[in-house]
Amino acid sequence: MGSRRDAFHTPPAPGCAESPVVGVDACRTGWVAVTLEEEGRFAGADTAAVLSELLGRVPDAAVVAVDMPLGLLAEGWREADLLATAMVAPHRSRVFSVPPREVWEADGYDDANVVCRRLTGQGLSRQSWGLAAKLREANACRDGGDHRLYEVHPEVSFAALGEGRPVPWSKKSWNGQAVRRRLLEDQGIVLPDDLGPAGRVPPDDVLDAAAAAWSARRIALQAARSLPDPPQTTETGLPVAIWY
């Protein structure tokens, strides 16, 4: 690892394997989290409207894996998204390409679309712009100094859980959720029927958070892989990669 990357994202120490880890996914009401205990088993689920509030509730977590782009480039497309798209092929629509930082600094969709075309030659979908608020929120947490945060993508994690094969069914379908839940259970992550308040969150978001937690556990064990390897870096040295 290069010195710039080490300065911001030193790999978890061996002792981190004895600490809980957390996976986080964005949902309609804010954020949902799944925590795994030291041995990688389900320890609890939580939800909050604001990510920083959720992070404050897990001070002992060694790693927090978030399903949200972390690390925005000054120009060009991120290698992480291109590689993740290839990994979940033929379901390429499950991954979106993240344009440069200036796009996300725009005041609204129309301005962001103009900036995106100027910088990349391509437009920005309204669906992608819909992530703007949460993307800014997550990056503010990491840029503000919480370097427990790592970017993950649940579909990449599920593909890894499936020995390189992406789940063929949509995460919102009965078949898709059954397969994803079984893949997690095969790793010892058994989600209970009663999740308390977090049980009000759509099941696909809970499953995504659990997959993120599986990746967080791998990061804590220093067994994770990154797309790309080694990660790209921002101009300030922050890593830009999807971990699984």
For the regions a protein language model found, what residue spans apply to each?
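RNase H-like (RuvC/DEDD) metal-dependent nuclease/polynucleotide-processing core
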Residues: 2-8, 12-21, 26-244
